[in-house]
């Protein structure tokens, strides 16, 4: 599939998505959202892909946020030049149909797709990550950053509010106090603060960033069953919002029952007893166990 705003490469079991609008500091557009969603669909459908890395083109920016080329109309649907291409959520009386896809936040549509990905996702932040450039990172499993990276949840400085479901993700990653500080002030801060506050896992020299991300991807997946990884990703992320450990017990019980009868479980035990590498054959593309139907997203509206 040909893309206009991103580059997609598959090598050594890793699908790498590179945000590719270097002349605009990889600024985010509705087309980029759709193309990134399609790339994650590709990753989930390809059993040769064991992990996903997301990075940016050039040395200046990972993603400088939403493309503000529309000026003051950037976040005002009724004044946008592309509103007819998107389909109109405006009713004849001028009110907004909030159930219409055109009324949804594009950043949230992307982060929810990343949240539902069946492969580990690693962010390799090579430069400025501001606005949606910062919030799209939050549902990724690991974030590695260049020492020159900068971050900013700048929404209050633009007269808007945090988007991309970041009000759910960010406090869970860094705590409510840090999340409020960053979002109230809208300040842009450096890689050292991001690392200190646990937004990023590690800092690397720019030339070492992608090699480190690839090494981590291989470490995470080399000896693990793909279906087990897919299920584990959903279990751990979704239980962040559980009201009681009984919810985890329910899903654990369903998944152990389903996976215990799978060929991968027999192979995992046999390989351990025989002291040899495991050869797992169950595939993510063939579908997850019926018990995974427990993972049902709420309706948008």
Predicted feature descriptions by range:
Residues 28, 101, 124-125:
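Structural motif
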Residues 1-55, 59, 72-76, 292-301:
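Conserved CoA-thioester-binding segment of acyl-CoA-metabolizing enzymes
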Residues 3, 46, 117-118, 262, ...:
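Acidic-histidine catalytic/liganding microenvironments
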Residues 182-186, 232-235, 256, 272:
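Short alpha-helical scaffolding segments that buttress acidic/His motifs in well-ordered protein cores
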Residues 112-227, 262, 266:
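Crotonase-fold acyl-CoA enzyme core
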Residues 17, 21, 35-36, 54, ...:
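Terminal peptide-recognition signature
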Residues 56-113, 129, 159, 243:
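Glycine- (often His-adjacent) and acidic-residue-rich active-site loop
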Residues 22, 144-149, 200-250, 258, ...:
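C-terminal long alpha-helix characteristic of the crotonase
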């Amino acid at each position: 599939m040909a893309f206009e705003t991103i580059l997609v490469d598959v090598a050594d079991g890793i699908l790498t998505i590179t945000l590719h609008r270097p002349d605009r500091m990889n600024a985010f557009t509705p087309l980029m959202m759709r193309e990134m969603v399609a790339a994650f669909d590709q990753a989930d459908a390809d059993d040769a892909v064991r992990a996903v890395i997301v990075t940016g083109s050039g040395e200046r920016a990972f993603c400088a946020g939403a493309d503000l080329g529309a000026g003051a109309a950037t976040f005002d649907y009724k004044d946008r030049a592309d509103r007819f291409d998107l389909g109109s959520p405006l009713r004849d009386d001028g009110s907004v149909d909030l159930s219409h896809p055109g009324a949804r936040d594009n950043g949230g549509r992307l982060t929810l797709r990343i949240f539902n990905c069946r492969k580990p996702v690693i962010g390799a932040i090579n430069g400025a990550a501001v606005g949606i450039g910062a919030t799209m990172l939050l549902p990724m499993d690991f974030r590695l950053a260049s020492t020159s990276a900068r971050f900013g949840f700048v929404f209050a400085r633009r007269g808007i509010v945090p988007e991309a479901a970041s009000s759910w993700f960010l406090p869970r990653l860094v705590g409510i106090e840090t999340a409020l500080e960053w979002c109230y002030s809208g300040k842009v801060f450096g890689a050292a603060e991001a690392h200190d506050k646990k937004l990023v896992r590690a800092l690397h020299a720019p030339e070492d960033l992608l090699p480190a991300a690839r090494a981590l991807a291989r470490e995470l997946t080399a000896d693990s069953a793909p279906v087990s990884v897919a299920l584990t990703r959903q279990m751990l992320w979704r239980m962040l919002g559980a009201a009681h450990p009984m919810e985890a017990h329910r899903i654990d019980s369903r998944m152990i029952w389903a996976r215990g009868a799978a060929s991968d479980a027999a192979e995992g035990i046999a390989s351990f007893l025989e002291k040899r590498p495991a050869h797992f054959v169950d595939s993510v593309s063939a579908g997850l166990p019926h018990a995974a139907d427990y993972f049902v997203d709420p309706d948008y509206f």
